């Protein structure tokens, strides 16, 4: 008989009695192996598997291919983006997951070229293969300021708790501050970031279903009066087949892009001197314009 105190929880809708202090990884170990569980929801909030399950918690497993799982996968991918490895003096912005992918903002760096993207992705694949663990640490504001003393954007997030920063909820929130370490197999820390998490247990689970897609300029906190940053975008999926299917969908959509077809068929154009998004129909596009106008008239008549 274990001397460990017992607690009551709800797992997948059913009551369970477990030892106090047990982690999600231990509680869900069979589902981790059988069903590809990579995280858990605790009282509705996504958590890392290495966190201890509290008494009274409602626990639900999160699989990699689920919506929550893909969001965690994509956020974890930002933590293997080896930009700081290539440019040690870069200033770290924010790195949230977005629809179908992720991005990370960087300051004090020149425009990112396609060659740089290829090199960053190459290094990401190496980090994924290494199987670095994502380790969560609770910190105080003073500890955060000390650890991130050379990172002005992170210091600002600590001070303001992310107020007004697009995507900053992945870094800080209303609760305490946390850091995530990328820990190598030998126990050394490869990289650290201010982050709320959650993350996958290991970089290896990111797999090969990711790719960097593009870069662009962005403003810190989305404010045009703020610093100009470089934003690197990527996409990530549960499998490489899912990635290829996504890339195929994008390629097919590009073929049907109305801007591309309009120019190729000499139907219309968007002259820059007139203004962005303002269409000029060509003679060959007269019938198309008529059909669009008639559709609008018909809809107005239908709805009175």
Where are the model-predicted features located?
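Ubiquitin-like/PB1-type beta-grasp interaction modules and other compact soluble beta-rich domains
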Residues: 1-83, 88-98, 122-123
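Auxiliary tRNA-acceptor-end handling modules of aminoacyl-tRNA synthetases
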Residues: 54-72, 91-95, 103-304
């Amino acid at each position: 008989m274990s001397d460990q105190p017992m607690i009551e929880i709800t797992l997948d809708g059913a009551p369970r009695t477990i030892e106090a202090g047990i982690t999600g990884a231990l509680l869900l170990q069979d589902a981790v192996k059988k069903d590809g569980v990579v995280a858990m929801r605790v009282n509705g909030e996504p958590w890392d598997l290495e966190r201890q399950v509290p008494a009274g918690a409602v626990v639900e497993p999160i699989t990699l291919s689920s919506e929550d799982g893909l969001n965690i996968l994509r956020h974890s991918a930002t933590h293997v983006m080896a930009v700081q490895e290539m440019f040690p003096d870069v200033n770290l912005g924010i790195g949230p997951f977005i629809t179908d992918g992720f991005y990370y903002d960087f300051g004090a760096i020149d425009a990112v070229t396609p060659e740089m993207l290829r090199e960053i992705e190459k290094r990401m694949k190496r980090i994924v293969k290494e199987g670095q663990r994502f380790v969560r640490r609770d910190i105080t504001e003073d500890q955060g300021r000390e650890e991130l003393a050379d990172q002005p954007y992170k210091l600002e997030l600590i001070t303001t708790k992310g107020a007004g920063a697009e995507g900053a909820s992945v870094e800080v929130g209303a609760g305490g501050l946390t850091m995530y370490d990328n820990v190598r197999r030998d126990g050394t820390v490869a990289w650290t970031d201010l982050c709320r998490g959650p993350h996958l247990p290991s970089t290896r689970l990111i797999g090969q279903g990711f790719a960097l897609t593009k870069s662009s300029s962005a403003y810190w906190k989305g404010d045009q009066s703020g610093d100009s940053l470089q934003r690197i975008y990527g996409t990530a999926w549960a499998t490489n087949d899912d990635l290829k299917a996504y890339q195929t969908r994008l390629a097919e959509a590009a073929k049907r892009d109305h801007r591309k077809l309009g120019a190729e068929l000499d139907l219309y154009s968007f002259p820059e001197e007139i203004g962005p998004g303002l269409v000029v129909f060509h003679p060959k596009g007269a019938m198309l314009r008529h059909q669009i106008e008639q559709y609008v008239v018909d809809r107005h008549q239908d709805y009175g």
